[in-house]
Amino acid sequence: MLTEFSQTKAFSMAQGSGIQHNSERSSASEKSVASSPKHLLAQKKGVGIHTGKNVLVSIEKSSQEGIHFSFSENNSSFQCPALWDRLSGTTRTTALVMRGESRKKVQVAMIEHFMAAAHIWKLHHIEAKLSLQETPAQSDIDTIEVPILDGSALEWCQALSPAQEVLSKQAVWLVSKEFEYADGDRKIRFEVKPSPTTEYFFEGTFGVLAQKASFCMNWLSSQKSQEEFLKKIAPARTFGFLHEVEALRARGLALGGSLDNALIIDGNGFVNPEGERIENELASHKILDAIGDFSLAGKPILGKISLKSAGHALHLRALQLAFENNCLQPGYLLPDGRVIAQSEV
């Protein structure tokens, strides 16, 4: 999610000129599994919301445990696991550092929507291979973005849901004791919840707009939770404020934004003619971001996570401190619904 994101084409519409709509964006596409190599699950192509560069993501089955990102350029390859200890940035996005054989590093940014979908669909063995679809102005690049698509997680859900895995014993993190991290009025709280679920609750204000949203993922009977996710959380788009556009453009951000991939706030309303896609879309998108960020723990966190006006930086700092304070303990979710600590195995 791009907190306080404002994009280029949306603002031109606010000034009375036209913008590019989805019907004109033939670059965003999905390749079916049937016409692809056996290991290729899907492909998505689209623009990076900050860089404005077109990127292809090829999602493949992998023998490696977990989710991995990779990128190749000039005969050099870079990769990283999708884990919080590979974090490289949390400014208006979540980014990880990919390393190669050389000392050079490449950052993979805007991973949170993809990660949220992969997490909810319980994927454990996939690799997301990113490739630029145009020649960069410089010989080497230091950042590549996961495409923003329509600004939500819907297209990622469609692409990833067929790859869902069924495990006889699912590794999890158990919230073993209450923990709270605050930065001023912004707070995150982890609470013990003796059930096979992860509960999310968010409340916050966006200018003059106050919103709340919640979501519960039941890891034992996930289909119902996934259906709820598709209705309440996945459609929520990244958003930002109209008045922030000049500052962001001056920083080289939001170059790929449009009304097709972002919900733009202006006062107590929205620039987008259709307004919100779902009720409390802003708060729902904050939960989407939180799911993607906390998925970097590598395993589901069983417990309740309450967020007040939190964003990427607070999410990842709270996760780090939760581990450092031994608030998250390894465990397993068994098919009969029992949740046991790793020490009990």
Map each language-model feature to its residues:
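Short acidic-hydrophobic catalytic motif
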Residues: 2-345
